[in-house]
A protein has these predicted regions:
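Intrinsically disordered, low-complexity sequence elements enriched in Ser/Thr/Gly/Pro
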Residues: 21-25, 38, 49
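C-terminal region of N-terminal signal peptides and the immediate post-cleavage residues
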Residues: 39-59
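Terminal targeting segments of Actinobacterial cell-envelope proteins
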Residues: 1-29
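Sec-dependent N-terminal signal peptides
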Residues: 27-38, 43
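N-terminal trafficking/processing presequences and adjacent post-cleavage segments
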Residues: 8-10, 33-37, 262-263
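Carbohydrate-active catalytic/glycan-binding domains of CAZyme proteins
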Residues: 16, 22, 54-373
Length: 373
Protein backbone atom coordinates (compact mmCIF):
# COMPACT_ATOMS: atom_id res chain seq x y z
CA UNK A 1 0.00 0.00 0.00
CA UNK A 2 1.17 3.54 -0.63
CA UNK A 3 -0.30 4.83 2.64
CA UNK A 4 2.24 3.92 5.29
CA UNK A 5 2.41 4.72 9.01
CA UNK A 6 4.09 8.00 9.77
CA UNK A 7 7.49 8.36 11.36
CA UNK A 8 8.55 11.15 13.69
CA UNK A 9 9.19 14.60 12.28
CA UNK A 10 12.87 15.40 11.79
CA UNK A 11 14.56 17.69 14.30
CA UNK A 12 16.28 19.75 11.61
CA UNK A 13 15.71 20.33 7.94
CA UNK A 14 18.13 18.82 5.45
CA UNK A 15 18.36 19.61 1.77
CA UNK A 16 18.21 22.74 -0.36
CA UNK A 17 15.68 25.51 -0.01
CA UNK A 18 13.46 25.89 -3.13
CA UNK A 19 14.87 28.54 -5.47
CA UNK A 20 11.43 30.09 -5.89
CA UNK A 21 11.55 31.35 -2.31
CA UNK A 22 13.64 34.25 -1.02
CA UNK A 23 16.50 32.58 0.82
CA UNK A 24 15.74 33.93 4.29
CA UNK A 25 11.96 33.61 4.03
CA UNK A 26 12.28 30.21 2.40
CA UNK A 27 14.38 28.84 5.24
CA UNK A 28 12.02 30.08 7.93
CA UNK A 29 9.00 28.76 6.05
CA UNK A 30 10.52 25.35 5.47
CA UNK A 31 11.76 24.99 9.03
CA UNK A 32 8.33 25.86 10.39
CA UNK A 33 6.81 23.03 8.37
CA UNK A 34 8.79 20.50 10.40
CA UNK A 35 8.45 22.19 13.78
CA UNK A 36 11.72 24.14 13.88
CA UNK A 37 11.94 27.89 14.48
CA UNK A 38 14.88 30.28 14.61
CA UNK A 39 15.34 32.35 17.77
CA UNK A 40 16.84 35.85 17.67
CA UNK A 41 20.65 35.83 17.52
CA UNK A 42 22.36 35.51 20.88
CA UNK A 43 26.06 36.27 21.09
CA UNK A 44 26.32 36.60 17.32
CA UNK A 45 24.67 33.31 16.30
CA UNK A 46 21.18 32.04 15.60
CA UNK A 47 19.69 29.36 17.81
CA UNK A 48 17.28 26.75 16.48
CA UNK A 49 14.45 25.87 18.81
CA UNK A 50 11.98 23.07 18.34
CA UNK A 51 8.26 23.38 18.83
CA UNK A 52 5.52 20.78 18.60
CA UNK A 53 4.97 19.76 15.00
CA UNK A 54 1.62 20.40 13.38
CA UNK A 55 -0.89 17.59 13.97
CA UNK A 56 -0.86 14.81 11.39
CA UNK A 57 -3.08 11.83 10.65
CA UNK A 58 -1.86 8.24 10.79
CA UNK A 59 -2.53 6.11 7.71
CA UNK A 60 -3.13 2.47 8.52
CA UNK A 61 -1.09 0.08 6.39
CA UNK A 62 -3.79 -2.20 4.98
CA UNK A 63 -3.71 -5.71 3.54
CA UNK A 64 -6.17 -8.31 2.31
CA UNK A 65 -9.33 -7.69 0.29
CA UNK A 66 -9.40 -3.91 -0.16
CA UNK A 67 -11.51 -3.40 -3.30
CA UNK A 68 -14.27 -1.25 -1.82
CA UNK A 69 -16.31 1.78 -2.84
CA UNK A 70 -18.09 4.02 -0.32
CA UNK A 71 -16.93 2.22 2.84
CA UNK A 72 -19.07 2.46 5.98
CA UNK A 73 -16.63 1.77 8.80
CA UNK A 74 -17.58 0.26 12.16
CA UNK A 75 -14.64 0.30 14.57
CA UNK A 76 -15.06 -2.45 17.14
CA UNK A 77 -14.35 -2.16 20.84
CA UNK A 78 -10.94 -3.33 22.03
CA UNK A 79 -10.43 -6.95 20.97
CA UNK A 80 -13.57 -6.94 18.83
CA UNK A 81 -13.71 -7.10 15.01
CA UNK A 82 -13.97 -4.06 12.76
CA UNK A 83 -16.37 -4.08 9.81
CA UNK A 84 -16.63 -2.26 6.51
CA UNK A 85 -19.86 -2.25 4.50
CA UNK A 86 -19.50 -1.00 0.93
CA UNK A 87 -21.23 -0.54 -2.43
CA UNK A 88 -22.26 -3.82 -4.00
CA UNK A 89 -20.89 -5.57 -7.08
CA UNK A 90 -23.55 -6.65 -9.57
CA UNK A 91 -21.67 -9.94 -10.01
CA UNK A 92 -21.87 -10.86 -6.31
CA UNK A 93 -24.95 -11.33 -4.12
CA UNK A 94 -27.26 -9.62 -6.62
CA UNK A 95 -25.37 -6.37 -6.13
CA UNK A 96 -26.10 -6.21 -2.39
CA UNK A 97 -23.82 -4.17 -0.12
CA UNK A 98 -20.62 -6.07 0.58
CA UNK A 99 -19.24 -6.87 4.03
CA UNK A 100 -15.59 -7.06 5.08
CA UNK A 101 -14.15 -7.83 8.48
CA UNK A 102 -10.85 -7.20 10.24
CA UNK A 103 -9.72 -9.01 13.39
CA UNK A 104 -6.41 -7.16 13.81
CA UNK A 105 -7.48 -3.59 14.47
CA UNK A 106 -8.47 -2.61 10.97
CA UNK A 107 -5.27 -3.60 9.16
CA UNK A 108 -6.09 -6.89 7.41
CA UNK A 109 -9.45 -7.32 5.70
CA UNK A 110 -11.41 -10.32 4.45
CA UNK A 111 -14.67 -10.43 2.52
CA UNK A 112 -17.36 -12.17 4.60
CA UNK A 113 -20.43 -11.94 2.39
CA UNK A 114 -23.17 -9.60 1.29
CA UNK A 115 -26.17 -8.18 3.10
CA UNK A 116 -28.59 -10.32 1.12
CA UNK A 117 -28.75 -13.17 -1.37
CA UNK A 118 -31.45 -14.19 -3.85
CA UNK A 119 -33.87 -15.45 -1.21
CA UNK A 120 -33.63 -12.43 1.08
CA UNK A 121 -33.36 -9.48 -1.30
CA UNK A 122 -35.82 -6.57 -0.87
CA UNK A 123 -37.92 -7.11 -4.00
CA UNK A 124 -39.84 -3.84 -3.64
CA UNK A 125 -36.67 -1.89 -4.51
CA UNK A 126 -36.68 -3.20 -8.08
CA UNK A 127 -40.14 -1.74 -8.63
CA UNK A 128 -39.20 1.55 -6.97
CA UNK A 129 -36.06 1.99 -9.11
CA UNK A 130 -36.39 0.23 -12.48
CA UNK A 131 -33.04 -0.85 -13.85
CA UNK A 132 -31.22 -0.91 -10.52
CA UNK A 133 -28.34 -3.38 -10.59
CA UNK A 134 -26.27 -2.81 -7.50
CA UNK A 135 -26.79 -1.01 -4.22
CA UNK A 136 -24.70 1.93 -3.14
CA UNK A 137 -23.13 3.70 -0.21
CA UNK A 138 -24.39 1.86 2.88
CA UNK A 139 -24.45 3.41 6.34
CA UNK A 140 -24.43 1.31 9.52
CA UNK A 141 -25.38 2.62 12.98
CA UNK A 142 -26.31 0.95 16.26
CA UNK A 143 -29.15 1.87 18.61
CA UNK A 144 -30.26 -0.01 21.70
CA UNK A 145 -28.78 -3.33 20.57
CA UNK A 146 -30.04 -3.15 16.98
CA UNK A 147 -27.91 -2.43 13.93
CA UNK A 148 -29.50 -0.25 11.25
CA UNK A 149 -28.16 -0.52 7.70
CA UNK A 150 -29.20 2.20 5.26
CA UNK A 151 -28.48 1.63 1.57
CA UNK A 152 -29.20 3.43 -1.70
CA UNK A 153 -30.85 2.18 -4.88
CA UNK A 154 -30.38 4.31 -7.97
CA UNK A 155 -28.96 4.40 -11.49
CA UNK A 156 -26.24 6.69 -12.82
CA UNK A 157 -27.42 10.09 -13.97
CA UNK A 158 -30.92 9.86 -12.46
CA UNK A 159 -32.46 11.02 -9.19
CA UNK A 160 -35.10 8.30 -9.28
CA UNK A 161 -33.60 6.93 -6.11
CA UNK A 162 -34.51 5.42 -2.78
CA UNK A 163 -32.82 4.90 0.57
CA UNK A 164 -33.86 1.60 2.11
CA UNK A 165 -33.31 0.12 5.56
CA UNK A 166 -32.45 -3.30 6.96
CA UNK A 167 -31.81 -4.26 10.59
CA UNK A 168 -29.91 -6.96 12.45
CA UNK A 169 -29.15 -7.79 16.07
CA UNK A 170 -25.50 -8.59 15.29
CA UNK A 171 -22.85 -7.84 12.69
CA UNK A 172 -21.16 -11.21 13.16
CA UNK A 173 -22.09 -13.47 10.22
CA UNK A 174 -21.06 -16.50 12.31
CA UNK A 175 -23.62 -15.71 15.03
CA UNK A 176 -26.72 -17.99 14.87
CA UNK A 177 -28.90 -14.89 15.39
CA UNK A 178 -27.42 -13.16 12.33
CA UNK A 179 -30.17 -12.14 9.89
CA UNK A 180 -30.84 -8.90 8.01
CA UNK A 181 -34.52 -7.94 8.11
CA UNK A 182 -36.03 -5.69 5.43
CA UNK A 183 -37.62 -2.55 6.93
CA UNK A 184 -38.64 -0.95 3.66
CA UNK A 185 -38.20 2.57 2.35
CA UNK A 186 -36.85 5.50 4.35
CA UNK A 187 -37.03 8.23 1.69
CA UNK A 188 -37.19 8.46 -2.10
CA UNK A 189 -36.73 11.08 -4.81
CA UNK A 190 -38.56 11.42 -8.11
CA UNK A 191 -37.37 13.16 -11.30
CA UNK A 192 -39.32 16.33 -11.99
CA UNK A 193 -40.68 16.47 -8.45
CA UNK A 194 -37.69 16.56 -6.11
CA UNK A 195 -34.59 18.70 -6.51
CA UNK A 196 -32.49 16.31 -4.48
CA UNK A 197 -31.22 12.75 -4.79
CA UNK A 198 -32.07 10.09 -2.19
CA UNK A 199 -28.71 8.34 -1.92
CA UNK A 200 -25.66 8.38 0.37
CA UNK A 201 -27.16 8.26 3.86
CA UNK A 202 -25.13 9.38 6.87
CA UNK A 203 -26.76 9.14 10.32
CA UNK A 204 -25.86 10.68 13.69
CA UNK A 205 -27.70 10.32 17.00
CA UNK A 206 -28.23 13.57 18.92
CA UNK A 207 -29.42 12.97 22.48
CA UNK A 208 -31.56 10.04 21.36
CA UNK A 209 -32.81 11.60 18.12
CA UNK A 210 -31.33 10.33 14.86
CA UNK A 211 -30.66 12.72 11.97
CA UNK A 212 -29.86 11.62 8.44
CA UNK A 213 -27.87 13.59 5.89
CA UNK A 214 -28.11 12.45 2.29
CA UNK A 215 -27.78 13.71 -1.26
CA UNK A 216 -25.75 13.81 -4.45
CA UNK A 217 -25.60 16.58 -7.08
CA UNK A 218 -29.08 18.11 -7.80
CA UNK A 219 -29.90 20.36 -4.82
CA UNK A 220 -26.93 19.22 -2.75
CA UNK A 221 -26.81 17.71 0.73
CA UNK A 222 -30.08 17.42 2.65
CA UNK A 223 -30.95 16.74 6.29
CA UNK A 224 -34.01 14.98 7.73
CA UNK A 225 -35.00 13.88 11.22
CA UNK A 226 -35.53 10.17 11.85
CA UNK A 227 -37.10 8.39 14.81
CA UNK A 228 -36.13 5.36 16.87
CA UNK A 229 -36.86 2.51 17.05
CA UNK A 230 -38.14 2.39 13.47
CA UNK A 231 -35.15 4.27 12.04
CA UNK A 232 -37.40 5.92 9.46
CA UNK A 233 -38.65 9.49 8.97
CA UNK A 234 -39.98 11.22 12.07
CA UNK A 235 -42.38 13.20 9.86
CA UNK A 236 -42.90 11.83 6.34
CA UNK A 237 -44.39 15.17 5.27
CA UNK A 238 -41.44 17.29 6.41
CA UNK A 239 -39.29 18.80 3.67
CA UNK A 240 -35.55 18.07 3.77
CA UNK A 241 -33.31 21.02 4.67
CA UNK A 242 -30.28 21.85 2.51
CA UNK A 243 -27.08 21.90 4.59
CA UNK A 244 -24.40 21.85 1.85
CA UNK A 245 -24.28 22.83 -1.81
CA UNK A 246 -21.75 23.88 -4.46
CA UNK A 247 -24.41 26.35 -5.72
CA UNK A 248 -23.55 26.19 -9.43
CA UNK A 249 -24.26 23.37 -11.87
CA UNK A 250 -23.53 20.48 -11.76
CA UNK A 251 -23.38 20.83 -7.96
CA UNK A 252 -20.79 18.08 -7.59
CA UNK A 253 -21.17 17.32 -3.89
CA UNK A 254 -22.27 14.04 -2.27
CA UNK A 255 -21.48 11.34 0.31
CA UNK A 256 -22.32 13.34 3.47
CA UNK A 257 -21.26 11.96 6.80
CA UNK A 258 -22.13 13.41 10.22
CA UNK A 259 -20.08 13.00 13.39
CA UNK A 260 -20.07 14.63 16.83
CA UNK A 261 -16.94 15.60 18.75
CA UNK A 262 -16.49 17.91 21.74
CA UNK A 263 -19.78 19.72 21.24
CA UNK A 264 -19.32 20.20 17.50
CA UNK A 265 -21.16 18.43 14.70
CA UNK A 266 -18.92 17.79 11.71
CA UNK A 267 -20.22 17.35 8.18
CA UNK A 268 -17.82 15.49 5.88
CA UNK A 269 -18.56 15.63 2.14
CA UNK A 270 -17.02 14.46 -1.13
CA UNK A 271 -16.78 16.83 -4.07
CA UNK A 272 -16.16 16.68 -7.82
CA UNK A 273 -15.89 13.47 -9.89
CA UNK A 274 -15.91 9.91 -8.53
CA UNK A 275 -15.48 6.56 -10.17
CA UNK A 276 -13.19 7.51 -13.07
CA UNK A 277 -10.17 5.49 -11.98
CA UNK A 278 -6.96 7.47 -12.30
CA UNK A 279 -8.94 10.34 -13.83
CA UNK A 280 -11.10 10.78 -10.72
CA UNK A 281 -11.07 14.25 -9.16
CA UNK A 282 -12.89 13.29 -5.95
CA UNK A 283 -11.77 15.14 -2.82
CA UNK A 284 -13.04 15.59 0.71
CA UNK A 285 -14.07 18.70 2.61
CA UNK A 286 -15.58 19.35 6.04
CA UNK A 287 -17.62 21.92 7.90
CA UNK A 288 -18.90 22.11 11.45
CA UNK A 289 -21.75 23.52 13.52
CA UNK A 290 -22.83 23.69 17.15
CA UNK A 291 -26.28 22.51 16.02
CA UNK A 292 -26.87 19.37 13.98
CA UNK A 293 -29.25 21.32 11.73
CA UNK A 294 -26.50 23.81 10.83
CA UNK A 295 -25.36 26.12 9.52
CA UNK A 296 -22.15 24.19 8.81
CA UNK A 297 -19.21 26.49 8.15
CA UNK A 298 -15.55 26.09 7.23
CA UNK A 299 -12.54 27.59 8.98
CA UNK A 300 -13.15 30.94 7.28
CA UNK A 301 -16.79 31.01 8.35
CA UNK A 302 -18.16 30.22 4.89
CA UNK A 303 -21.46 28.35 4.94
CA UNK A 304 -21.30 24.94 3.25
CA UNK A 305 -24.83 25.59 2.00
CA UNK A 306 -23.38 28.54 0.05
CA UNK A 307 -20.38 26.76 -1.44
CA UNK A 308 -18.00 26.74 1.53
CA UNK A 309 -15.97 23.78 2.72
CA UNK A 310 -12.68 23.21 4.55
CA UNK A 311 -10.38 21.02 2.37
CA UNK A 312 -9.60 17.71 4.08
CA UNK A 313 -7.98 15.26 1.64
CA UNK A 314 -7.30 15.28 -2.11
CA UNK A 315 -5.19 13.54 -4.74
CA UNK A 316 -1.51 13.16 -3.88
CA UNK A 317 0.82 11.06 -6.00
CA UNK A 318 -0.62 7.62 -6.70
CA UNK A 319 -3.46 8.14 -4.21
CA UNK A 320 -6.09 9.53 -6.58
CA UNK A 321 -9.59 10.79 -5.86
CA UNK A 322 -10.11 9.97 -2.17
CA UNK A 323 -13.76 10.19 -1.09
CA UNK A 324 -16.97 8.32 -0.27
CA UNK A 325 -15.98 8.62 3.39
CA UNK A 326 -17.30 7.52 6.76
CA UNK A 327 -16.13 8.10 10.33
CA UNK A 328 -16.02 5.80 13.35
CA UNK A 329 -14.33 6.35 16.72
CA UNK A 330 -11.67 8.68 15.41
CA UNK A 331 -10.99 6.87 12.13
CA UNK A 332 -11.82 8.10 8.64
CA UNK A 333 -12.49 5.45 5.98
CA UNK A 334 -12.66 6.24 2.27
CA UNK A 335 -12.00 4.78 -1.14
CA UNK A 336 -9.27 5.92 -3.50
CA UNK A 337 -7.82 4.95 -6.87
CA UNK A 338 -4.33 3.54 -7.18
CA UNK A 339 -2.57 5.19 -10.12
CA UNK A 340 0.25 2.66 -9.77
CA UNK A 341 -2.23 -0.18 -10.39
CA UNK A 342 -4.10 1.20 -13.38
CA UNK A 343 -6.58 3.18 -11.30
CA UNK A 344 -8.02 0.21 -9.38
CA UNK A 345 -10.04 1.18 -6.32
CA UNK A 346 -8.85 0.63 -2.76
CA UNK A 347 -9.89 1.06 0.85
CA UNK A 348 -8.09 3.70 2.90
CA UNK A 349 -8.30 4.23 6.66
CA UNK A 350 -6.68 7.02 8.63
CA UNK A 351 -6.74 7.92 12.28
CA UNK A 352 -7.54 11.61 12.20
CA UNK A 353 -5.58 14.23 14.10
CA UNK A 354 -7.19 17.39 15.43
CA UNK A 355 -5.67 20.85 15.53
CA UNK A 356 -5.85 23.37 18.36
CA UNK A 357 -9.01 24.91 16.90
CA UNK A 358 -10.81 21.57 16.74
CA UNK A 359 -10.50 20.94 13.00
CA UNK A 360 -9.79 17.43 11.71
CA UNK A 361 -6.49 16.75 9.94
CA UNK A 362 -6.40 13.85 7.44
CA UNK A 363 -2.97 14.41 5.88
CA UNK A 364 0.02 12.43 7.11
CA UNK A 365 3.36 13.89 8.21
CA UNK A 366 4.92 12.73 4.94
CA UNK A 367 2.20 14.44 2.89
CA UNK A 368 2.56 17.64 4.85
CA UNK A 369 6.30 17.67 4.19
CA UNK A 370 5.64 17.17 0.47
CA UNK A 371 3.12 20.01 0.49
CA UNK A 372 5.65 22.24 2.22
CA UNK A 373 8.02 21.75 -0.71
Amino acid sequence: MTDAPDGPAPDVLAGPVPDALPRRRGRAWALAAVGVVAAPPVGGGAVLLTRPAAPAATALELAGDLRTHDPALVVGDEGEPWYVFSTGDVRVGLGAPQIRRSTDGGRTWEEVGTVWEAGTRPRWVYDAVPGVENFWAPEVVEHDGTWYLYYAASTFGSNRSVIGLMTNTTLDPDDPAYAWVDRGEVISSTPGEDNWNAIDAGVVDVDGTPWMAFGSFWGGIQLVELAWPDGTLADPDAEPVTIASRIGSPNAIEAPYLAERDGWYYLFVSRDSCCQGSDSTYNMAVGRSRDVTGPYVDREGRDLAAGGGEPLLATRGDVVGPGGQSYSKGYLAFHWYDAAEGGDFRLGIRELAWDDEGWPVATTREEQAQDAG
